[in-house]
Amino acid sequence: MKLAVIGGDGIGPEVTAEALKVLDAVLPGVDKTEYDLGARRYHATGELLPDSVIDELRAHDAILLGAIGDPSVPSGVLERGLLLRLRFELDHHINLRPGRLYPGVSSPLAGNPDIDFVVVREGTEGPYTGTGGAIRVGTPNEVATEVSQNTAFGVRRVVVDAFERARRRRKHLTLVHKTNVLTFAGKLWSRIVAEVGRDYPDVEVAYQHIDAATIFMVTDPGRFDVIVTDNLFGDIITDLSAAVCGGIGLAASGNIDGTRTNPSMFEPVHGSAPDIAGQGIADPTAAIMSVALLLAHLGEDAAATRVDRAVERYLATRGNERPATTEVGERIAAAL
């Protein structure tokens, strides 16, 4: 396995180091190449993501990312020039966000309900394509537009992926959208879900408006198995799912090219947290959980299961203790 590692900014390098510690324990001998991308490189060279680096990344089987973002760089520069460019250049059209409440982890929901679902979010379309503009900027007559692009090709491939995951899980899929208002995109999504669903007669299909889905995620999260949704709604609902599952510090993610033409990228979603960077207190659990997703994607199912179970054992016994960053990695690696 050839793995590209992008530590990135803030706590990114710290949590990534612990994730690699666990990876080495469960699957020794992975060929790792580290890439200096993020705020430091931007300040030193003015570069965000050179074409030559993109070409090098394509030669790897997967990418492990720590975090991107730094207050010394204007908002949007790193996000669009590095993060979004990676996702678009490498065709990461599936954003995978598992939502599971592990034993021993407290949820803000009463009674610590049984929560185990996955959100399959479209990752390269919607309003994140940068299509739009503004005229008469700074005047009382300013007009700004953001265009949400949805293609049959793009929707179909993420819907097929979601149905495949539902078939392997509890055989239930929920489309989340706002079809009563966003009628053009809504009809496209609804039609394709219905068309693809005919090939999966064993999977039950439901629909929820995005506003209703947020209510049920709080009041009845057990109803969800696989959620499929567009880029914007997925961005919102996945952070809510992280909150009900114990916090964003336990949220892992995968940015996946379902065709496997390009390497998929796996990362914790907690951000760079520059306020605690270098203090040795960042929780690397989400980065380690992202390694489990990475292993599963590459067909290393046994190793992925071992990491997931080691994380589960660690969380079940952690209680209110908040160990140092390196200690978390050592404990989970030892549990393997």
From Swiss-Prot:
A Pfam family: Iso_dh
GO MF term list: 3-isopropylmalate dehydrogenase activity; magnesium ion binding; NAD binding
Q: What is its EC number?
A: 1.1.1.85
Q: How is the cofactor bound?
A: Binds 1 Mg(2+) or Mn(2+) ion per subunit.
Which metal ions or organic cofactors does this protein require, according to UniProt?
A: Mg(2+); Mn(2+)
Entry's family note: Belongs to the isocitrate and isopropylmalate dehydrogenases family. LeuB type 2 subfamily.
Designated name of the protein: 3-isopropylmalate dehydrogenase
Identify the species of origin. Mycolicibacterium paratuberculosis (strain ATCC BAA-968 / K-10) (Mycobacterium paratuberculosis)
Q: What is the lineage of its organism?
A: Bacteria, Bacillati, Actinomycetota, Actinomycetes, Mycobacteriales
Recorded name of the encoding gene: leuB
